[in-house]
Swiss-Prot record:
Expression induction: By cold stress.
Lineage, top ranks: Eukaryota, Viridiplantae, Streptophyta, Embryophyta, Tracheophyta
Main location: nucleus
Subcellular location: Nucleus
One GO MF term attached to the UniProt entry: DNA-binding transcription factor activity
Protein name: Dehydration-responsive element-binding protein 1D
Domain of life: Eukaryota
Entry annotated with the keyword DNA-binding: yes
Protein family membership: Belongs to the AP2/ERF transcription factor family. ERF subfamily.
Gene name for this UniProt entry: DREB1D
Annotated stretches, region: Disordered: 1-31, 131-153
Amino acid sequence: MEKNTAASGQLMTSSAEATPSSPKRPAGRTKFQETRHLVFRGVRWRGCAGRWVCKVRVPGSRGDRFWIGTSDTAEETARTHDAAMLALCGASASLNFADSAWLLHVPRAPVVSGLRPPAARCATRCLQGHRRVPAPGRGSTATATATSGDAASTAPPSAPVLSAKQCEFIFLSSLDCWMLMSKLISSSRAKGSLCLRKNPISFCMVTNSYTALLLEYIILQMNSMIVLIHELSKYQVFLLLTMITHHLFQWRR
């Protein structure tokens, strides 16, 4: 009995020594969790080819996937996945990029059983059209000039911007500014100026006595100060004065 126990103990010891500490990894394909992208849907890494591959699952079927293609970058493969899903699911597709719906313009394609779906062809075609769009700074000079000319012709007219000489002004004294603002407040639609230099900046005054007092206080604090405003439009100057008035009103409350 003791001999059998000793023999079994030696057998277990020899088997434990023969077994490695870490089991060998089974040969074959790597798991999907280890090769898929951490952010993009339907994007996997193929290590042997060194490229990103795209496969999409057919809606309404269990386990059926269609091979779309391979790309060098994960972003390009994600665009391919979006194009294929738009062709398969339409507006209800789960996309990697929010702008793929209007940027790719993919038509809805029905899935044909047993054949490669038109979704793959639509995805490839739309991705090729998306690649043809020149990136900023990579196009030719003539194309960039023509594009800038078209943008300039279609752009809305911008507000006039005054030069540095036109925008330079000196604030008046407190008494003179109060007399000037009293004349402006007398009319509901009066327009005035706080400048003495050439080309003064005209802006609408708020018909409110308390606002006039606040403006008078601001000018009193900034008395005899030369202010240089470079390339500011009239609207920006008005917004600046309004912001100062608002902060001063909050401070006095």
